């Protein structure tokens, strides 16, 4: 087990190196002294960029051998060496004063949660059906069969295993298997747990100039101890990584709207592309985010937001072309696209809408799963809107609601019974909007506390 953990650590160091190169080009750090404070967002950038590149490499016929991964990560790391115009750091500077005792206590608590999360992941068996039959199965197939073998990834006997789902998570796990030198389906759970841990550490840095540090760390502690997230982060499923990438895409997109830094728009595009490469549900999620960004950006920057959305969607084209070339049913038999605009078909299923929506809201509000993240965020949205921070409040509420609407739409038009959907997916599909609300909770709390003492944050002209 120890050697496998070391191998996985080496693979993640490659991701970190890739992220360091891309992150430096985007202003996450400039000098070596800046890097330690930016490690968490840099790591997430590295996994996102490497995962997307790995998917493209598989489509191109590569097998993700160790030398190929090292070469690819080295190429991404070299991006940081390209001379670029320096306009300061994209990340807000850390607080100049030493943290107060309460902040240190919160940081220690978050650190303890991270350690426990990683330990739980390292010893957790491969017991989730979707992980065993879909996500880790595909990672094993990539490793054992030397890439995308059409006999499996386009094979009729495997059609019920969602062959059309994107490959970022299986690709990243396959890289982990390569560096382990073995297929350890237990240790590999650490990979998704690392992504969640990185999000918890990255959010306070991304919001350092917007919220008091104590509020930021208290909020991520609330996210980190949410029972449902702890369970999913080490289960080998794609829902937690999807939520991580989407939260980063939304936070970076909001920062671009508020501050006008193009680097944040590029980061939002990268993480949106990672969302698309992680799970099929990511497509409507990204569409919802881009729509809200286009509306919120204002006249002068709407074209940039549209361009960012188009760039993110373009990254998914190679995988879609591979599916089409190999005759894979991209609806997997669940979504009858020919019926989507059939009034008779839709009218006969209207009863699914209130039932599905109510079930999703019920799961999101469960204190035994998500504590008080959703109620706290809902109250903060209302108070922030009444206090003058309408732009931020509407941005967060609109993205979260549109994400839920996209899930309800899938429940409405999908062929499987509504009972099947609610029993097998409802508790997981709310992960993305709940983590989104948790990521913005410190911003909303600060906005709500201001009342009408200050003007709302307006984007630069």
Residue ranges and their predicted role:
Residues 174, 196-207, 294, 359-362, ...:
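Hydrophobic, aromatic-rich transmembrane alpha-helices
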